[in-house]
Amino acid sequence: MQPEFIHLRTQSSYSFLESALTIEKVVELALLHKMPALCLSDRGNLFGSLEFSLYAVKKKLQPIHGVILNIQYDINAFAQILLIAKDETGYKNLLKLSSLTFTKNDRKICEHIGFEDLIKYQEGVIALCCYTDGIVGKCLLARKQEQAILFARRLQAILGDRFYFEIMRHDLPEEQFIENSYIQIASELSIPIVATNKVLFSEKSMHYAHDVLLCISEGVTKEYPDRKTVSENCYFKSPAEMRKLFSDLPNAIQNTINLRERCYFAAHPNPPMLPNFSTQDISETYLIRKYATEGLLARLVTKFKAENISLEHQEKLKTEYFTRLNYELDIICNMNFAGYFLIVSDFIKWSKKQGILVGPGRGSGAGSVVAWSLLITDLDPIKFGLLFERFLNPERISMPDFDIDFCQERREEVINYVRSKYGPNRVGQIITFGKMQAKAVIKDVARVLSLPYKLADYLTELVPFSAINPVSLEQAIREVPELANAAKGNGLYNLEGDAELIKLVLDTSLILEGLHRHSSTHAAGIVIAGTDLVDIVPVYKDANADMLIVGYSMKYSEIAGLIKFDFLGLQTLTVITNCKKLLKEQGIKIDFDDMTFDDKKTYQMLCKGKGVGVFQFESIGMKDALRRLKPDSIHDLIALGALYRPGPMENIPTYIACKHKLQQPDYLHKLLEPILEETYGVVIYQEQVQRIAQVLAGYTLGAADLLRRAMGKKIKKEMEEQEEIFVKGAIANNISPSQAKSIFSTVAKFAGYGFNKAHAAAYGVISYQTAYLKANYPAEFLVACLNLELNNHDKINLFLQEAKDNGIKIIAPNINISEGYFSVKSSNTVITHSTKSVISRLNCDIKKIAKDTAVKPLYCKDESTIIFALGAIKGVTANFGKLVTDERKARGAFKSITDFIERLPPKSINSKLLENLIKAGCFDELHDNRLQLFLSIPKLIAYSTSYHQEQESNQFSLIKVSSLSPTILVSSDYADKNTLAFYEFEAMGLFLSNHPLTEYQGIFSRLNILNTRDLYNKLPNGTNRVTLAGVIQKKDSRMSARGRFVTLVLSDPENIFELTIFSEEVLKDYVHLLDVKSLVVVNCDVVKDEGGIKLTAKSFLSIEDVMNNRQFELQLYPQNYAELEQIITLLASRTSNGYQSNAKATIYLQSKDVKHFIAKITLSETFFLQVQDFEVLNQYIR
């Protein structure tokens, strides 16, 4: 049957925010209308071409590749042209032309090509002069018929019979205005006309949703008057509709069929294409064998020396290692992967020569001796029992895949090296596409339809969040009752609003969900090709970047034949690098190359659960696991890293019990003891599954890898086939069928969540390295951690608390000592002359300062000290800190706040920055009244402006202000401790010198209010009801399928902790207490298990309520008459006289030497104590 019509103007969502159709949808529509072919012609790119081609071929539809580009025809004048690939040459030219629009230097107005580009790359290309948006149409709309004919002739001369006029009928006035002239020109020049229809949505009823999509693209609402719109006729018309529409131009319809017959190319998969590593006449096979052999010899020399191996044993090991090396080399070379290994080895060797820290390995690649020999990995695979077949299976050919971790700060240097070696046109990043997912699409649509923000925000919160498997809107409506109710037009349960508008938002969102919204780049993927990328794939380049980006997603880049290399930036490696730099400045050199993993101090620290900052071991649950495990070898760290995941986690107690000989290991069979001995009978690693199959059932390691994969996928048919092979092999090994089936079942259960040992071992090594640095050089290590988290105040708080727990002193921010980043000072810290004078003055005048004034200790003369970074203060950058440091180095310490203002550029200081510097205490050394400085900020900023204006105009005052002046600072009392504590919290996101709850700790212990430090030490596993106190630092409202819940982040003097409120009643009853900065006592359930602890709030009290409603039994110990007098005076003023009381008191009088008591006085009166009283009494409570 002769086809009736073929659409040539179909756009998908790869025309970002312009089409409401996915690739799958356009193919389905073509099949629905019985079209034998379809042309995908997205605007400006070929990003979807391979995906379209593969899907169309799969569905037995002929794909035709097209692209709509802008072409420049005059100065600042651009028109559209539709280019279609006739054959493979034409497709490659489309790749070049579409890529040129992104890589040309003159793309400021729009991405475009020029006539010279079309001339250069016209071979195999069919061109359609777009109708009203094309050159001819634009000239006719401007009433320039002669110019229209001129350009038509020019394009015809370039393309010959491959040039067509497109004609459309969307019932638009501009189309009708030019139609007669357009057809006349085509006739005069013998240019065939082809009928098209813009296809931007599936059916006419989708026009409204598509209109919303266009509003999203422009960032406007539906009511906005001057915005882009399209005709309601831009839908996927049927052949019958098109034939009827162009009944007067039957040739225009027939030409779509004729054009289809001229096109015979479909984009297809390509085999992997790597560049040639060797530019000389030397084979890659020769090179890899040469470099690997030399590398292994060097590795063994280091190994023998570090492990003190005898000469006799060295020869045995050499035989073992070289046998394995040659086995691997044979497989690698037979698979033609030598070049891949050489390329990876080359850029890693270069990185190490430049001092760029590279991870010891990642993924299964660490199981290769060849990789170890070529310095790709730093893990001895034989020593750690790693398998090459887990990485490269000779029985299942697939590309090897090395994921490489680099120091995050220097990753770009490695990428630039690769670009320079292989050519910038052959190396690129990989594009990624952001989609309009459930929450995002609701926000977008709600904004366009002017739904009030509060309602829009509530709607998005109703969609459950899942980072791993994002919940679709359809699924959310199905599973969340309130959303389902709203989707039916019945409104929301908890908020009033226009129910019909809410329904319209959800209906429209359902239509637009899943469309591409924007593009970005893959975080780590880099491709290296053997030819220019544009010969294989479309390329894209960001206007502000220099590096090419492959226009296919990662999946389709690999199908197109490109090889991906993952250049990952691992922050932990940056921590290690920076820590080693700090130690090098002190003359301490750390070399991990010959590390033996036996440092006692490291394991002692880990046994105490001190995992803060230690790679992989930072979570609360992991720290508890360390305390229970008490690791004493690198193998324990590797195993714990592999076990601490959902599923395997349930085996942690068994592993620990067997390690400490509280339980006998179950090895399943005596033959398996050597395989499972290392992990106490627990099958942890995928490599163990492979070895079990090899030893018990006679599998080759390659076949065992296929078994492991089958067990992981749990495909029933495959599992049945593998079980039959396993049992048959075990029977041949004198094992009964029933035992063989039992072992297979047990191993299959473990294999389902078994971990890659090569990866676990490599990351276990990084864990050990960080633990070693922390155990032996805690100050330097924690400073390295802090400096990567300058803007993460929760992490800063955590690391500083860890420093205090390690006996490291913290110097608060100080404008005369602090730098942009955190720094370490040892006991020989230089104390400036101004500091000495302040300390002397404070010693003399301390008694004159009000009791409620907080003066921080400024310096520590003990061992290592961490100096707080200026860049960690909110609104202050590390660059500003450098500016301050450079000024101090050049002209000495600042003498006053006005001296500071005078010496720094006025543009570098603003009110907010100055406020946070003051609140953080940066000027305490220069002026001890922070409140006064804070209140004086407007005058200080005004002074800065006038002073620098005078400097610029050279009109200097006769009297220069050089110290604090009453004309600049307002008069003020001193702030109390809590005010200063919250100043610091506002400026730094943490309580540094004083926590608001510190003064209550003695009282809390009497009221059975726990400190967070006690949660792990004192509570058994299971669910416990406890009372905690904290300051609310963060409040976050979220929504799950079960309803709304609130997460609170609190702190006490020891820790930051998180608790959740699930009950709406609790939220309603205590909402008045749940503001940020509130001091609360919370009654909560604590669930403690291997996964950590989870806190769920049940009720709250304010600190005042606790003080007013609890009875205190005070035991007071004055040491002299003055102290006794102070106690009596205070208590006398708080006598309850029979009314409300909260305390009884007993006073113990002591001898002068404080060794025994003279008298015990139990006071008969009761007292009503207030919060501030404990500031005085706390010093006498034991």
UniProtKB/Swiss-Prot annotation:
It is an enzyme of class 2 (transferase). Keywords: Cytoplasm, DNA replication, DNA-directed DNA polymerase, Nucleotidyltransferase, Transferase. GO terms for molecular function: 3'-5' exonuclease activity; DNA-directed DNA polymerase activity; nucleic acid binding. GO terms for cellular component: cytoplasm. It is found in: Cytoplasm. GO terms for biological process: DNA replication. SUPFAM superfamilies: PHP domain-like. It comes from the Bacteria. Its EC number is 2.7.7.7. It catalyses: DNA(n) + a 2'-deoxyribonucleoside 5'-triphosphate = DNA(n+1) + diphosphate. Belongs to the DNA polymerase type-C family. DnaE subfamily. DNA polymerase III contains a core (composed of alpha, epsilon and theta chains) that associates with a tau subunit. This core dimerizes to form the PolIII' complex. PolIII' associates with the gamma complex (composed of gamma, delta, delta', psi and chi chains) and with the beta chain to form the complete DNA polymerase III complex. DNA polymerase III is a complex, multichain enzyme responsible for most of the replicative synthesis in bacteria. This DNA polymerase also exhibits 3' to 5' exonuclease activity. The alpha chain is the DNA polymerase. This is DNA polymerase III subunit alpha. It comes from Rickettsia prowazekii (strain Madrid E).
